[in-house]
Amino acid sequence: VPVDPTNMLDTMYNFATSTTVYDPYGNTHTATIAFRKRPDLPEQVDAATGLPIPGTGVRNQWEYYMMLDGASLGQVPGTQIAVGGGFLQFTDDGKLIAATSGSFEAQPGGVGPDGQPLPAGPPRLVPQPVDPASGVPQFAVPFNGEEPIILGVHLGDGFNPDDPTDPRTGLDGITQFAGRYNVLRTSADGNPSGSLDNIYVESDGTVTGVFDSGYTRPIGRIVLTKFDNSGKL
């Protein structure tokens, strides 16, 4: 089934998992990451030499999509909308090599044999560079139809199977093994909205606020000083 990012159905992907994320106001939303296996294809053959062309085959590759309910994006509630996605590459023994970023782009329709224009095809996921500062795929999410904020997705640290000195294992995040799909752990940063419930002052003068959401953070600092003879102040 072709992927339609404006109306993602469960027939368009193999597996999915969800986690809670927060908009700029602290409201909670459910973000779902869905995974779709790409068909394994053999390498193309050079017609002149009869030899396989390296890098032309597809093996152990997946696409993934970040989806939110339309209500979270100021659109039709109950509709799963993909705000972006990317590509996963694994080794034959299931280790992650790379998790890259991608965006959806419309496919032009072209012109038919009779010279008449053909309708545009469904949007296609195309690779995009990963943000070098964060090192993880990032997606612009327009919560409630407002100015987009950036959400990053860390699926694991891929490793280089051709470099024996690479300290990364490719096993710290998502993997591809035989057996049933299983989610061991997900986490997300961010916090819900909360009201200031209590404050306390650290020994260095830092004023820490405790919010009823359970979140704790520094909110100020008091300048402290010490006098040798406080009685002469």
Regions found by a protein language model. Name each.
Residues V1-L233:
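S/T-rich, low-complexity, solvent-exposed segments of bacterial secretion/appendage proteins
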